[in-house]
Amino acid sequence: MPGTPNMTYKFTNAIIRKPNKSIQNALSSQYLNPSYEKVLQIHKNYISSLEEAGLNIAILNSLEQYPDSIFVEDPAIIYKKNIIILNPCDSTRNGEAKIIKNEIGKYFEKILIVEKGTIEGGDILNINDHFIIGLSNRTDKLGAENLSNLLVSLGATVEICHTPKNILHFKSECSLIDDDLILVSNKMSKLDYLKKNYNLIELPSGEENAANCIRINNKLLI
């Protein structure tokens, strides 16, 4: 795929949000209610891991009125020096995009907005200057096409495909760990597009959650 090698996982800065107590009411495909105290500890460990990876960290205030707001990738993505404001699907997340735009938009050269359809960052896999958008219960065709047009205008290439059934987000069960190497669950390994274009590491049955990881410089966070 075209692009600057390593651009996808070479980071100097991170934007995260403080956990909110209302995360216990966050959306879940497994109908789980996470413990706020446990989330605080995991978040603390996450910050330590980011610091060990050499990142500067901007910490946004918690948003109690939005249970899922700790997941800052869903309402916005960053490409080059631009921020693209997305349109989360669920009504409980409708205000997050506007808030994050006001919080960090000033730090970017351009603010672009997906005006139509629904789309969340969890359905977008970035591989250097290429993007794979997975259609899901959270991301529809109209939202994917609108984002695609914005990305192409910035010089990117885009592929739109379907997320397998019963997977919340495209990246719930796949993650980029090198320029052409993707860690995948068994379901994701069957996608023709991924099989034809990338080297895949398939996780064993029962280890699907490990596919939801992130490569940061020389560290892999699971």
Role assignments for model-derived ranges:
Residues 2-222:
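The feature marks the mature, well-folded catalytic cores of soluble enzymes
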